[in-house]
């Protein structure tokens, strides 16, 4: 990020992380929203180029944010780790470069004292995303329908074109 933001981000990050190290767990990211369209295109390109592998990605193997809460379990997975798994272990360079332009600052609680949940720093890119699935429980059916009907990312990132693969 531009140098004028670094001190602000560093100070804010420190206060936020210090608080959540003692009150649960936390992640924080600064995103250049002007880059989101480029990120959607990069994700779309990877998803559509690797759609035959979509069913092979086991979300149980991915870093999941909020998994300690039944309200949020299954809703947000680390984007970079998902793309790496989808591509057989290595994310394409153009995707990685776009992610770096989009997510300009990240942080997480390294050792929260009051939570059993830990962020895996090796699999934390600062950007999570919902991964639609074929689960038929009411919770997932509701969220898949909401994702399809109300969130622009569904169409922008290529999920709409792959529904016949992951859908139910």
Predicted feature residues:
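Terminal, contiguous helix-loop blocks that mediate binding/assembly
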Residues: 1-168
């Amino acid at each position: 990020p531009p140098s004028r933001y670094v001190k602000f981000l560093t100070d804010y990050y420190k206060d936020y992380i210090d608080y959540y190290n003692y009150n649960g767990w936390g992640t924080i990211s600064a995103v250049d929203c002007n880059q989101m369209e480029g990120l959607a295109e990069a994700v779309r390109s990877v998803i559509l180029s690797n759609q035959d592998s979509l069913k092979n990605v086991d979300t149980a193997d991915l870093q999941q944010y909020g998994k300690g809460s039944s309200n949020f379990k299954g809703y947000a997975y680390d984007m970079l780790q998902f793309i790496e798994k989808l591509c057989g272990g290595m994310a394409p360079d153009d995707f990685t470069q776009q992610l770096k332009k989009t997510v300009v600052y990240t942080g997480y609680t390294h050792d929260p004292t009051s939570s059993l949940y830990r962020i895996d720093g090796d699999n934390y890119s600062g950007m999570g995303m919902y991964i639609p699935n074929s689960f038929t429980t009411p919770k997932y059916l509701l969220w898949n329908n909401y994702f399809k009907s109300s969130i622009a990312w569904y169409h922008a990132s290529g999920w709409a074109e792959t529904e016949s693969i992951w859908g139910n």
